[in-house]
């Protein structure tokens, strides 16, 4: 998906109002805290001009590093400044590989003035769908089905399916601090009997405007200004840039149909690409080499589940140990109110944001703003619990 969605609906200096569809100043713009560059990548995404050609995550990372080298050469005032990489959703796959590539080619990047300090992943796909979606799906369903108007009868049938598959109480059994070993995958688990998908169908039956991005959303559910509908993971051409074509030359964009999320994959479909999950490959090393890594997750996201992220972290080994040794239990405070829980160990911080969607900065801009301050070192960890 295009980073322009982030600019205009989440953390940019102006933000579209989803009711009036007018752009309004964003008091929680990340540009208040640091210099920001939003990048449409890989090639084939948004307004990017390059042709899709990547066949591995390493090639995605190499392409991005090449962009950075050109950018720093073109704008020499960037050279020597501290750099962080941030992104949400599928960027959870890209960012660890990009950071890993930069660290592995440190001499070239240091010479060019590129100094990476850390990464920030928001509701990211850094693990496989079994851990991120399927294993915690029954627990999520039990926590939210009443608020989503799903019937007791439907839930009973879903619970029976979860029992048969072996995930009915998976989180309760296996999410431990410290972990007791690698996570087991139930033998009965298969895509044709997906509890995750079955609950999604029940939610859509109960609420035509059900959004996997924000499970408590209600009607109406029109397209937003970026051509996105909360009920769908697809993007549509009815958006700001296509309906206001005079904007394109102002931002030096080509005169082409803009989609906030590409309908065609921006890289060649290869099985290898979809099995390169950072948690099993590069993420542990990136955490160890970075000054700070933050993983955020909105508790009301059903694209990826909050306890899927927790399970993934507890199944990952970095800096000499598997998972967190202590359970996340520190309160994140924003303006004197509880905004979530957080925990830090061995240069990794996990933050679970209350009542937040897949796009935390869109629905909960204040916590997102404070967490950026923490990433940048403008506040310390002990300040997260201060109003």
Residue positions per predicted region:
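Terminal and linker regions of secretory-pathway proteins
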Residues: 1-387
């Amino acid at each position: 998906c295009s980073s322009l969605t982030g600019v205009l609906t989440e953390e940019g200096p102006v933000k579209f109002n989803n009711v009036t569809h007018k752009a309004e100043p964003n008091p929680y713009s990340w540009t208040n805290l640091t210099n920001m560059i939003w990048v449409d990548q890989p090639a084939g995404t948004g307004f990017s001009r390059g042709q899709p050609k990547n066949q591995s995550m390493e090639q995605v990372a190499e392409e991005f590093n090449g962009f950075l080298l050109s950018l720093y050469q073109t704008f020499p005032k960037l050279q020597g400044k501290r750099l962080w990489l941030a992104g949400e959703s599928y960027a959870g796959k890209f960012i660890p590989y990009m950071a890993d590539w930069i660290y592995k080619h440190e001499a070239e990047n240091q010479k060019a003035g590129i100094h990476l300090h850390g990464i920030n992943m928001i509701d990211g796909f850094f693990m496989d769908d079994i851990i991120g979606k399927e294993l915690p799906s029954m627990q999520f369903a039990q926590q939210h089905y009443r608020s989503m108007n799903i019937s007791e009868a439907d839930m009973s049938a879903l619970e029976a399916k979860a029992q048969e598959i072996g995930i009915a109480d998976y989180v309760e059994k296996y999410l431990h601090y410290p972990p007791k070993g690698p996570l087991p995958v139930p033998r009965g688990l298969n895509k044709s009997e997906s509890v995750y998908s079955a609950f999604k169908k029940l939610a859509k039956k109960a609420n035509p405007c059900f959004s996997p991005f924000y499970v408590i959303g209600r009607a109406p559910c029109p397209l937003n200004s970026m051509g996105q509908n909360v009920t769908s993971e697809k993007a549509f051409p009815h958006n700001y840039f296509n309906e206001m074509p005079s904007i394109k030359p102002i931002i030096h964009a080509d005169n082409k149909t803009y989609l906030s999320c590409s309908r065609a994959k921006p890289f060649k479909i290869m099985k290898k690409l979809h099995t390169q999950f950072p948690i099993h490959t590069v993420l542990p090393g990136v955490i160890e080499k970075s000054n700070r890594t933050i993983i955020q997750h909105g508790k009301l996201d059903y694209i990826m589940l909050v306890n899927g992220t927790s399970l993934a972290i507890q199944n990952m080994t970095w800096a000499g140990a598997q998972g967190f040794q202590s359970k996340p239990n520190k309160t994140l405070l924003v303006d004197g109110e509880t905004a979530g829980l957080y925990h830090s160990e061995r240069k990794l911080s996990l933050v679970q944001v209350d009542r937040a969607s897949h796009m935390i900065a869109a629905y909960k801009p204040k916590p997102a703003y404070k967490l950026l301050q923490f990433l940048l070192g403008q506040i310390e960890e002990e300040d997260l619990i201060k109003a």
